[in-house]
């Protein structure tokens, strides 16, 4: 990664925010020969508890964009997951997953930026947008003039407010994510990774996912509670005790849940954007809408934005003069983007309802699903018993 001391005065695209969306879009546009300014307040992305795992579906998006080789150097790969439901072993899944520390991943992506796309370290203090050119003023007085402004600032609000666009909360404090390291080593863990679903709806826990991350075992737990409630405070004080009570079926496999780090917590609200259909500026990723991490579709949604902008819209827009709202609206109305956003919201609400919904419909669904799963567990045990008896009967 090169650092720009004097940012380019005139560019095709100015991207504010060098997280997942902003950095990958800048990388792709730079490789395509576009003149790009990538601006972020921080030279090095700080350690931050956010996404820590993706599946093969998301990796295929990176592969489509030619970014998979870069990404695979920054992740830990797994292929084997033992799943526990209803307090019992349920399934052995063979599927590829990729784990990472978010801050380290973003810094690795920044390091892979092409030389023609330096990172401009600075804070945007003024924004002017229009149908032809967009003007950014940084705290040091530097001015960037661009045909298109892309806002990829995640949950940051400063640039959003400067543009005059509002974030609308659809479901406040929708879910809670927790992350922590286990003391047990990957070598002694016994399984490559484990997913354990809560046995009781009253616990309001979706599941815990335990996976290798480098030379340590990492746990992510997804639940439907508030960061300020007594249960959450108690868990942060005594995570080992509460985990052994909540999920005794996997405690022995997890070194009795001895914890080797503080418990990190992230409260998630579902949100959308209002007033974004305007000249010259695009909001992408979490700067446009936020979904729940429990279903695991967030990075896929973010990279769909990047893909559609890079592959479809920006090349078309730059072919002709102007950057009025009619061009911008083509992105927001893109059926691929719309489907990804709508699916992300749909599964966010569904995951909460099927886990902790108290209405008759959701209680009936849980009963149906758990009955079917219990029958599957019994069937597997019967088959296993039959296989054990067969040799002695021969």
Q: Which stretches of residues belong to each language-model region?
A:
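Conserved N-terminal helical subregion
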Residues: 8-10, 60, 64, 71-165, ...
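Conserved N-terminal glycine-rich FAD pyrophosphate-binding loop of Rossmann-like flavoproteins
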Residues: 43-63
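Conserved FAD-binding catalytic core of PHBH/FMO-like flavoproteins
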Residues: 152-251
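C-terminal helical "tail/cap" subdomain of flavin- and related membrane-associated enzymes
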Residues: 311-394
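N-terminal Rossmann-fold NAD(P) dinucleotide-binding loop
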Residues: 22-23
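FAD/FMN-dependent oxidoreductases across multiple families
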Residues: 227-318
């Amino acid at each position: 990664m090169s650092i720009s001391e004097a940012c380019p005065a005139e560019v095709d695209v100015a991207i504010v925010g060098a997280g997942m969306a902003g950095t990958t879009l800048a990388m792709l546009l730079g490789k395509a020969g576009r003149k790009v300014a990538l601006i972020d307040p921080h030279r090095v992305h700080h350690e931050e508890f956010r996404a820590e795992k993706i599946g093969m579906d998301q990796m295929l998006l990176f592969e489509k964009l030619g970014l998979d080789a870069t990404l695979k150097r920054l992740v830990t790969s797994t292929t084997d997951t033992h799943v526990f439901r209803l307090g019992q072993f349920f399934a052995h899944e063979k599927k590829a997953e990729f784990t990472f520390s978010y801050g380290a991943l973003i810094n690795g992506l920044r390091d892979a930026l092409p030389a023609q796309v330096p990172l401009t370290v600075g804070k945007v203090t003024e924004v002017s947008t229009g149908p032809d050119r967009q003007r950014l003023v940084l705290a040091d007085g530097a001015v960037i003039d661009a045909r298109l402004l892309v806002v990829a600032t995640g949950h940051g609000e400063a640039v959003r407010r400067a543009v005059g666009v509002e974030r609308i909360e659809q479901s406040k404090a929708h879910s809670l994510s927790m992350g922590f390291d286990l003391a047990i080593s990957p070598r002694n863990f016994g399984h490559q990774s484990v997913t354990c679903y809560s046995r009781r709806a009253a616990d309001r826990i979706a599941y815990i996912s335990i996976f290798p991350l480098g030379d340590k075992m990492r746990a992510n737990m997804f639940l439907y509670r508030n960061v300020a409630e007594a249960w959450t405070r108690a868990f942060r004080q005594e995570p080992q005790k509460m985990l052994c009570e909540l999920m005794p079926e996997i405690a022995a496999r997890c070194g009795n849940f001895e914890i080797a780090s503080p418990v990190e917590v992230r409260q998630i609200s579902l949100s959308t954007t209002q007033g974004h259909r305007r000249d010259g500026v695009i909001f992408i990723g979490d700067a446009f809408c936020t979904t729940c991490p429990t279903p695991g579709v967030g990075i896929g949604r973010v990279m769909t934005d990047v893909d559609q902008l890079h592959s479809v819209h920006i090349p078309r827009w730059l072919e002709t003069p102007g950057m009025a709202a009619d061009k911008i609206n083509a992105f927001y109305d893109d059926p691929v983007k719309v489907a990804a956003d709508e699916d992300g919201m749909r599964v966010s609400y569904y995951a909460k309802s099927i886990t902790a919904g108290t209405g008759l419909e959701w209680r009936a669904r849980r009963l149906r699903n758990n009955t079917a799963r219990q029958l599957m567990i019994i069937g597997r045990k019967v088959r296993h018993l039959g296989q054990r008896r067969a040799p002695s009967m021969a």
